[in-house]
């Protein structure tokens, strides 16, 4: 089930392993997420739009690898990205995070851990969107003073 107060979130799952994407998509759908699949980085960039709340991204893929895909996503979007990859060495994890990934989960992984991490990322992203700054003008002798209130 998706967590209370959260509408069904749309996830873009990007991996060239068809069997894995089929399995993961089914697990995520049963958990309450809407899932769209792309099998390489270029396909992901073509499909990515504002309706996606999260991208799950492999690194080792044909056409456009996950690192290059992440760089291109970060040029135009702040959508949360979680790397899901067999490249689990410390240098790979650090590089992914430094390039803008929000989380990094090496394969193989536990389905429950994946879903828990997804929910945590979406919860943080939702909380950030709710922080709306109110601008309150105050007039004082023909000058306007602005107070920004969080």
Label every PLM stretch briefly.
Residues 10, 120-150:
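Short, Lys/Arg-enriched segments at the junction into DNA-binding effector domains
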Residues 22-30:
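Charged docking surfaces used in two-component/phosphorelay signaling
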Residues 39-40, 65-68, 92:
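Acidic catalytic/metal-coordinating carboxylates
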């Amino acid at each position: 089930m998706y967590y209370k107060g959260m509408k069904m979130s749309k996830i873009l799952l990007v991996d060239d392993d068809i069997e894995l994407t089929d399995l993961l998509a089914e697990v995520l759908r049963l958990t309450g997420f809407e899932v769209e699949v792309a099998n390489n980085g270029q396909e992901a960039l073509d499909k990515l739009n504002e309706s996606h709340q999260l991208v799950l991204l492999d690194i080792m893929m044909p056409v456009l690898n996950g690192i290059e895909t992440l760089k291109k996503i970060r040029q135009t979007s702040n959508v949360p990205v979680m790397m899901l990859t067999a490249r689990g060495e410390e240098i790979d994890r650090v590089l992914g995070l430094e390039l803008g990934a929000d989380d990094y989960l090496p394969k193989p992984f536990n389905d429950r851990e994946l879903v828990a991490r997804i929910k945590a990322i979406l919860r943080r992203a939702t909380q950030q969107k709710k922080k709306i700054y109110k601008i309150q003008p105050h007039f004082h002798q023909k000058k306007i003073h602005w107070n920004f209130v969080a």
